[in-house]
Amino acid sequence: MRFDLERPSQNASSHRVAVLLINLGTPDAPTPRAVRRYLAQFLSDPRVVEIPALLWQIILRLLILPFRGVASAKKYAAVWMPEGSPLRVNTEKQVEGLRHLLQLNDYTVLVDYAMRYGTPGIPAMLNQLKLAGAERVLLMPMYPQYSSSTTATAFDDAFSALKRMRNQPEIRTVRQYADHPAYIAALAAQVHNYWHQHGRPDFAAGDKLVLSFHGVPKRTLDLGDPYHEQCQQTGALLMQALELTQVECRITFQSRFGKAEWLQPYTAPTLKELGAAGVRRADVFCPGFTADCLETIEEIGMEVRDEFLHAGGKDFHRIPCLNASQAWIAALGEIVAQNLQGWPVQALPVPHTTGA
């Protein structure tokens, strides 16, 4: 194996500790070509699709990418913002918020972000942080619940990059924070703030709150992945914080891909059933997504909304994700600070000298 050439740090004396927020990724543009490139990288990850690689690549290249690239590009175009992809825009705002919060608390740390798929990639950002003087890096996945297909593959990518480095930085990882009190409090604050602005559902009249988490194949649960358990844990704690019962609040799973069985109940059929059963208002919140993206804005806010209304529902509300809300930035800062303990994150005072 050939190791990377080590270049001198550009700022070795200023910042020795870095925090790297990691999210899933996004295409660079809402075009079929860009989306196909992104999906090819995403769906080629063996932690995402666990079937024999050769067989899967034939299916992916011949049957999925040519058609799904066009269809997905249309969906991305429907949610694309003037500044770019919603996930990228929201993640950049989270970086800015966390950086500002840590600076207010006298932390002299670098804060940036990387995407597991697409740009900026994890290896490139690790190298960039090293050039900026980082000798210690905290990897902070923006996935509150651990899963092999999200958290683990992000760490895989980071560790693969380390294997090529001659001079490796010290690494810490945040595995999960599904039950962290600050995270749960931020979720509850987000829901309460939305209800304060748009009105609270009439739960006594049968209105519902649905907590929709990203789905994964059920097979991963059977193989020992803790994701389902942690989603249930987050949901239960959030219900408790909101003082809701399991009759008033449901936990579901969205974004099913392919024909295999995924974690259930599925979000879209659940909303369709609620509408058909006479539920007037349904609010949907996605606690596992820390930033709004295609799956929350388009899938929930458009597709699932239409399913509910066409089935007979009257009032649909998509509660925005945590994004860069004040409560979430404060919670993120608390989680990060706890995981930075023992590292030199604050500037040392310059000793005063006196003349003889």
From Swiss-Prot:
CDD domains (UniProt xref): Ferrochelatase_C, Ferrochelatase_N
Any one GO biological process: heme biosynthetic process
Coiled-coil spans in chain: none
Family: Belongs to the ferrochelatase family.
Catalytic reaction annotation: heme b + 2 H(+) = protoporphyrin IX + Fe(2+)
Annotated InterPro entries: Ferrochelatase, Ferrochelatase_AS, Ferrochelatase_C, Ferrochelatase_N
GO function term, MF aspect, one: ferrochelatase activity
Annotated signal peptide: none
Domain of life where this protein originates: Bacteria
Subcellular location: Cytoplasm
Official protein name in the record: Ferrochelatase
Keywords: Cytoplasm, Heme biosynthesis, Iron, Lyase, Metal-binding, Porphyrin biosynthesis
Organism expressing this protein natively: Paraburkholderia phytofirmans (strain DSM 17436 / LMG 22146 / PsJN)
This protein's encoding gene: hemH
Metabolic or biological pathway: Porphyrin-containing compound metabolism; protoheme biosynthesis; protoheme from protoporphyrin-IX: step 1/1
Function: Catalyzes the ferrous insertion into protoporphyrin IX.
Gene Ontology, cellular component aspect: cytoplasm
Binding site for Fe cation: 214, 295
Pfam families associated with the record: Ferrochelatase
EC number, UniProt record: 4.98.1.1
